[in-house]
């Protein structure tokens, strides 16, 4: 917010995603449908990271992996925003995995796999980490980035931990358990698709 004010754009709202009510977003409500769409979008993003980063270092034609990503990214966007889109969330998850699983790569080549971990913004935002994935790939490595949805699971597990070890109320524990089960259920189509693939490991 401070950065927006300094840039002369104080009217732009900053929406805080938090479950403990520390910040209120006036005029903005998280409806169940919006929350579900947001989780679907995160799952799509996690799938793209898992699939694209796995095959791009081994592509036979430079740029072909990114082209496939762009094609399926638009399909994923349409599934969330276009009522006329006939593909369901589960079908898009399967389509992404199957497309990248069939993508032609150099099967004889194996590169060192390098994990990217750390603070959430730096881990996922190329501008914040100086395009680390591209740097690693240019240096002959295969980048591995943990799923963003696991960060939310980690946050929810904190509710269970605080109840069990720090004396927090049972409400936080119950909400955490419901949240974890809900995320697992929404994520299941992606997990199932990854389990059936040749190249990819499920979370």
Give the positions of each predicted feature.
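An N-terminal assembly and electron-transfer interface module characteristic of large anaerobic redox
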Residues: 1-203
